[in-house]
Amino acid sequence: MDLRTVNVTRYIMPLREGGSLPALAEADDDFKYVVKFRGAGHGTKALIAELIGGEIARALHFRVPEIVFLQLDEAFGRTEADEEIQDLLQWSRGLNLGLHFLSGALTFDPIVHQVDVQTASQVVWLDALLTNVDRTIKNTNMLMWHKELWLIDHGAALYFHHSWENWQKQAVNPFLRIKDHVLLPYASQLEEADNRFKQILTEEKLQEITDAIPDDLSLIHISEPTRRTPISY
């Protein structure tokens, strides 16, 4: 699996959501991207979670904006007036992650937008697998674009990788925070989702996704045993 690499050419505006301070930027392919910076929040681990979570979702046939690697030149942002943003840009020199910007998309609202029980069950199954704590009624991290449901923002997934201690034990523990999932009340076909997705999400597919993680996002070389830990989990 090959992700495209493009260069950031224009910083448009910050998207002040959560602690990661993503931004809207334009790249040299003339497309706009939501940039996830390596210098923000949980750093490169959040970017790795974004990549793995987004590409697993795509492999399961969910709609996910294209994920690209974004190269940030060291001179970029020197004229930025906001010191916090200027610091963030300086700390994020090099390789970052971007999601194709879906212009005109609306934030999913369960009161306004309806999803069928099959889709709801499949999204809940995905987030239980990813241990994604960030798809709640307060922050759905889903968009409606051209009347279709899109999944975004998986940077809070795979939280086990912030501490490798006892990851084998964590892997078999129930994911209790799934109780807060925005679509859980509608997810009445979890067994069907489980049966279907287990056939699609093979070890080979997971290996292909984790192989796409560049060493540069890890600050150190990723050993093969470490790279395989998300697969084992």
What does each model-identified segment do?
Residues 2-110, 120-123, 129-133, 146-148, ...:
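Conserved ATP-binding subdomain of kinase catalytic cores across diverse folds
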Residues 10-20, 82-90, 168-173, 194-203, ...:
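Phosphate-binding glycine-rich loops and adjacent basic patches that engage nucleotide phosphates
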Residues 113-116:
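Helix-boundary and loop/linker segments of multi-pass membrane transporters
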Residues 136-138:
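Canonical protein kinase catalytic loop motif
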Residues 141, 147-212:
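Catalytic-core segments of enzymes that bind and process phosphorylated/nucleotide-bearing substrates
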Residues 210-223:
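Short helix/strand-capping connector loops at secondary-structure junctions
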Residues 220-233:
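Residue-level detector of conserved catalytic or cofactor/ligand-binding positions
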